[in-house]
């Protein structure tokens, strides 16, 4: 009965796709309430007219929604909060970083807290058995790292391999061989995978879940592992005659998987010569390598022998011919590996790199961001002052504009960093805007990389804006990027100050200093000197001079609050001069006169401009004693302006006889010191002759 019903239904379906004529059309008109078409199908005639036909039924394909599709839709309706720090930090004023150093410290603290929580959960799993998450979240539940199978069997070996217990897996394998048990080829290959991936060493983790009652042998092994960490800064190296080689030699039967695993492990741990020799053995046994093994062999060919470029390039081409002979289709990583290796040869590899790029497009492989990153770095020559080789970035951006990318290569997150670096070296702001627009397209922002890459990208981008853009646009970018996107370095703030100077917008300087303090640049001497120099260089309206004086007082407090051992060397004469001048111009004369004591205390020479303004201030207040103090300061450092200041005191102030004698003595001392210095210079000249 079911078969008959199915046949009738198929017959009805086949008739629905044919034009309705005659009796069947009339039948359809009698039953207009019946819908045998999907919602997307339409009638060819309006109801009430002669129906000449119906479009074929189109059943829409099922749409599979992501579990977080609703959250993604909601997230697309809002933009980044430009007034807040990055989202990774908690919404707590005590946990919000104010500088790049604090952000790194907070991220490390957050990761440390996660590791501690995982350690507690996995150390005491019996207290965390209640699963309150709906749906189930596996990473929140305890993980069991200790083997449950105690007997000597192949199942126990498989369990230890799955738990990534390197030493325990090797011990179990040896016990099986001693017991006369034959281990299957599949299990042995899995053990080789484990050994080759970790270089025959226990995998390093941020936390270790060891039982408190571990044996002495295991404790000694952990001590040995900790001692080796100092020598493994740049990764684990392949040791000769290690367990992987020993087990590989003991295998009675080896297949392609066995050879490929060993070759990839040797290349990963920088045993390039051994990998190439093992590939020769694979060919002698008439076996074939897979595409991932060929990718590793390409890297080994470039890194193994110190040969010329032509010889290494010919060997790479030979490996590619082997791939064709073995009917192995290259993938994206094959071409990216070639391009990455070609970067070692700089100018010589440019033409082959373009050939590789054309070849991968010809066989239908879409380049990834890492592909273009390697091309950019290959054509970018830091020693070329004209940057002629960097112009390839324009062709790359014309090809990439508007595209959305998905992760395909581990080096994909380096593209935007290298592209913005080229924009900065070319001083091309329009190109930088194109790169930034590509970053904001779709989910491309995820490829900006880790924290240090993001800081590098945005610092280069904003520095170029400060150099090339109008000041109003620059300030808008400043509000948009800082601190929500990244925390600026002190040099970035200096570039912004220079942009304000060019645009004659010095009234923004007090705000820049306030922001600099929040970002942890209070004790950056180069930044403080730049701010003081810009404020004290010219005279400004009274209200602006008052704001500048307040800023100068704040900087003076910063100098005084730093460690005592740094105070003397961090009080440059330029800063003392600028602070005193700013105090004078704002009418804060008492604070300005107090600055004179700092010149003597730190043995710093005042500038003539400051001494003249101090003399003007003394004249306004009609204070001969202050005027004489200025002369004394100039005389103490034997400045040439001392004589001119003395004449001004004699002509502009009413002084008594005692003050005249003091001035005469100061002038005499200055003359004697000038004579001594001139005689010393003459004697030095004669000796030189």
Swiss-Prot record:
Q: What InterPro entries does its record include? A: Pentatricopeptide_rpt, PTCD3, Rib_mS39_PPR, TPR-like_helical_dom_sf
Q: Which Pfam families match?
A: PPR_3, Rib_mS39_PPR
Any idea where this protein resides?
Answer: Mitochondrion
Listed GO CC annotations: cytosol; mitochondrial inner membrane; mitochondrial matrix; mitochondrial small ribosomal subunit; mitochondrion; nucleoplasm; plasma membrane
Acidic residues composition-biased segments: 673-689
**GO BP term, pick one:** regulation of translation
Q: Which PROSITE patterns match?
A: PPR
Q: What is its main location?
A: mitochondrion
Disease entry from the Swiss-Prot or TrEMBL record: Combined oxidative phosphorylation deficiency 51: An autosomal recessive, mitochondrial disorder characterized by intrauterine growth retardation, low birth weight, poor overall growth, progressive limb rigidity, delayed psychomotor development, hearing loss, and optic atrophy. Brain imaging shows abnormal bilateral signs at the basal ganglia and brainstem. Patient cells show decreased mitochondrial complex I and IV levels and activities, and generalized mitochondrial translation defects.
Q: How does it assemble?
A: Component of the mitochondrial small ribosomal subunit (mt-SSU). Mature mammalian 55S mitochondrial ribosomes consist of a small (28S) and a large (39S) subunit. The 28S small subunit contains a 12S ribosomal RNA (12S mt-rRNA) and 30 different proteins. The 39S large subunit contains a 16S rRNA (16S mt-rRNA), a copy of mitochondrial valine transfer RNA (mt-tRNA(Val)), which plays an integral structural role, and 52 different proteins. Associated with the 12S mitochondrial rRNA (12S mt-rRNA).
The text of the family note is:
Belongs to the mitochondrion-specific ribosomal protein mS39 family.
What the protein does comes down to: Mitochondrial RNA-binding protein that has a role in mitochondrial translation.
Q: What's the protein name?
A: Small ribosomal subunit protein mS39
Origin organism of this chain? Homo sapiens
Q: What gene name does this entry carry?
A: PTCD3
